[in-house]
């Protein structure tokens, strides 16, 4: 049979992690196979039709900065865009887009089908080919064998998936899709720690049965933001509003009186649900003092009447779902198109992974997305891109790569997962990053695109656009630095008139821009400068106004980096290190940290223990790198 069976990288799963993994590998010139159980669901948004949000948009921008598809697909499908925390500092500002579910999926599929070096094949994976602790390939449902140097598993909620509605349950990967049972059994045979997690989704509502006149309209921002560094507002489809309503005492009474019929509260569901996206029954139980909860009514797309009621995810029986939905203002006559449900699935302890997202026990086997205990499209996409990149690097015989915590939210995400593990679905927040003033969403390209080009992830068009932006920032900063304004001149008076800022002596425009009361646009207007690219202007203003804070963070990073990057030998025996308690020896032996920095973040590992590790490394000569940099 003349059918390709040998590839360099195989990606299992065509969700948000799988698509980014396959695209990253193929962009690097590696022959890549994407296996999916259904080509029609590539890039499907299983839960809410939205991309971005606090912490999450930072990941999307980083995926974009490394050449990924998520941000551009959002710009081409986004039907409402907003910047959250717009009145706060730039570190925590976040772009969020409501997407047309059908358009988003179509855009992702188009990108996949036009990517060189990428083959797509519709077949479920039932088995892994493993020889001498190295993955060699996969076996599909109909017995086809595909071989590769690296395999990336991005199975989402499909591994042993079990769907719950009330006290009834059935096998499923998500509503309408079969689970992956054979692969789940095979994975449990591997020497990896496995657990169960749970997530859920709300019932979908027919918009023609909803009274929007009693709800609060929530329009998008003007001017309309964009998600991708390569995007523009002209890409966006027609923009629409979302709406806000609330649960009430009657809603809460309905839920509370039926908790005995909830699979969560009757012990049927074993998996732990997401803390930061709780079901409505969980909200009522945990926040019993609250009289109401917000419900965001989000359109699913421009060509459908379906609405996504964000805030009432539930696995209660259907009759209870209907009653609680109709108790909410504006939805008294609501027609439910699809019931809400909860889904339980297998995940694997991410502490069994390296920074590359390769498993420690099976060479060439990489995990990305919900299989690692995360929740969210953005977290999945970020892991997929990293796993796909490292799978390709391995196939090419090159060293693996992962950004540090001070370089990217992707680095924070991976470090948290492989060091701390997770007992509940992990969601990204800006508060998880120590260096968030440096890790802003607006500068993701300046932080990562050069590295992406070096890795082979960035095409010529994106590289040219990046270089133009980077050079434009340098030119404008130099112009502002070398342009001086004197008191009692026409320009000086224009600045006084516009900002009420007296000039006691000569100032450069860069010094003036550092003042809190002076903004870049007003400064250019007052001094007669020419308009420049808004992205360039934004960077110049942020870098100037926050220069002191940014410099302090950079100094702190430089001090920590020497010990942070010191690698721990793979064969280190912690039980032989004098002075380490048995508890700490056990924690280090179980986690097997790759660097001293990672070891320092393991719960219970003290600064004194890190000092003992340093002494041990110097004794055996493994601390040479630290000594040279000191």
Swiss-Prot record:
GO terms for molecular function: flavin adenine dinucleotide binding. It is found in: Cytoplasm. GO terms for biological process: tRNA methylation; tRNA wobble uridine modification. SMART domains: GIDA_assoc_3. It holds the Pfam family GIDA. The keyword Cytoplasm applies. Its main location: cytoplasm. Its cofactor is FAD. It comes from the Bacteria. FAD binds at residues 13-18. Transmembrane segments: none annotated. One of its GO terms (cellular component) is cytosol. InterPro entries: FAD/NAD-bd_sf, GIDA_C_N, MnmG, MnmG-rel, MnmG-rel_CS, MnmG_C, MnmG_C_subdom, MnmG_C_subdom_sf. NAD(+) binds at residues 273-287. Keywords: Cytoplasm, FAD, Flavoprotein, NAD, tRNA processing. NCBIfam families: mnmG_gidA. Homodimer. Heterotetramer of two MnmE and two MnmG subunits. NAD-binding protein involved in the addition of a carboxymethylaminomethyl (cmnm) group at the wobble position (U34) of certain tRNAs, forming tRNA-cmnm(5)s(2)U34. Belongs to the MnmG family. This is tRNA uridine 5-carboxymethylaminomethyl modification enzyme MnmG. It comes from Pseudomonas putida (strain GB-1).
């Amino acid at each position: 049979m003349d059918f390709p069976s040998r590839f360099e990288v195989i990606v299992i799963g065509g969700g948000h992690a799988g698509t980014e993994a396959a695209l990253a590998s193929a962009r690097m010139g590696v022959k890549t196979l994407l296996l999916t159980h259904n080509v029609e669901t590539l890039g499907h948004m299983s839960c809410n039709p939205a991309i971005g949000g606090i912490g999450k948009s930072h990941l999307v921008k980083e995926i974009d900065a490394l050449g990924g598809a998520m941000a551009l697909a959002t710009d081409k499908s986004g039907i409402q865009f907003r910047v959250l925390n717009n009145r706060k500092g730039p570190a925590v500002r976040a772009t969020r887009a409501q997407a047309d579910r059908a358009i988003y999926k179509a855009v992702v599929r188009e990108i996949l089908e036009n990517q060189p070096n990428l083959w797509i094949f519709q077949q479920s994976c039932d088995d892994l080919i493993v020889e001498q602790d190295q993955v060699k390939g996969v076996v599909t449902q109909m017995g086809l064998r595909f071989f590769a140097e690296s395999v990336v598993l991005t199975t989402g909620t499909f591994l042993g998936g079990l769907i719950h509605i009330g006290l009834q349950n059935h096998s499923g990967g998500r509503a309408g899709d079969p689970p992956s049972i054979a692969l789940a059994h095979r994975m449990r045979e591997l020497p990896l720690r496995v657990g169960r997690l749970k997530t859920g989704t709300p019932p979908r509502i027919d918009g023609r049965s909803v009274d929007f006149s009693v709800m609060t309209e929530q329009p998008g921002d003007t001017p309309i933001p964009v998600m991708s560094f390569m995007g523009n507002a002209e890409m966006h489809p027609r923009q629409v509003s979302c709406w806000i309503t609330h649960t009430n005492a009657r809603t809460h009474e309905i839920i509370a009186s039926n908790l005995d019929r909830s699979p969560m509260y009757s012990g049927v569901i074993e998996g732990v649900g997401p803390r930061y996206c709780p079901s409505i029954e969980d909200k009522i139980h945990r926040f019993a003092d609250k009289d109401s909860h917000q419900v965001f009514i989000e359109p699913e797309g421009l060509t459908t009447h379906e609405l996504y009621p964000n805030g009432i995810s539930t696995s209660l029986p259907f009759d209870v779902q209907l009653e609680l939905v109709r108790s909410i203002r504006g939805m008294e006559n609501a027609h439910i198109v699809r019931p809400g449900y909860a889904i339980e699935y297998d995940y694997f302890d991410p502490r069994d992974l390296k920074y590359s997202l390769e498993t420690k026990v099976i060479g060439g086997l990489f995990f990305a997305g919900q299989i690692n205990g995360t929740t969210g499209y953005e977290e999945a996409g970020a892991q997929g891109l990293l796993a796909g990149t490292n799978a390709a690097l391995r196939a090419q015989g090159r060293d693996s790569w992962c950004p540090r915590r001070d370089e990217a939210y992707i680095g924070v995400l991976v470090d948290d997962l492989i060091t701390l593990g997770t007992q509940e679905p992990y969601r990204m927040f800006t508060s998880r990053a120590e260096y968030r003033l440096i890790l802003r969403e607006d500068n993701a390209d300046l932080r990562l695109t050069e590295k992406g080009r070096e890795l082979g992830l960035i095409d010529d068009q994106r590289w040219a656009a990046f270089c133009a932006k980077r050079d434009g920032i340098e030119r404008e900063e130099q112009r502002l630095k070398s342009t001086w304004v004197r008191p009692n001149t026409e320009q000086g008076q224009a600045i006084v008139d516009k900002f009420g800022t007296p000039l006691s002596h000569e100032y450069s425009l860069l010094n003036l821009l550092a003042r809190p009361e002076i903004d870049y646009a007003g400064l250019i207007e007052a001094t007669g400068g020419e308009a420049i690219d808004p992205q360039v202007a934004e960077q110049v203003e942020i870098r100037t106004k926050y220069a002191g804070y940014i410099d302090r963070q950079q100094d702190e990073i430089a001090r920590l980096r020497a010990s942070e990057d010191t690698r721990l030998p793979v064969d280190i025996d912690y039980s032989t290190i004098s002075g380490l308690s048995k508890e700490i020896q056990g924690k280090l032996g179980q986690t097997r940290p790759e660097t001293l920095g990672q070891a320092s973040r393991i719960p219970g590992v003290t600064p004194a223990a890190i000092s003992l590790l340093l002494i041990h490394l110097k004794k055996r000569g493994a601390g040479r790198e630290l000594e040279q940099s000191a």
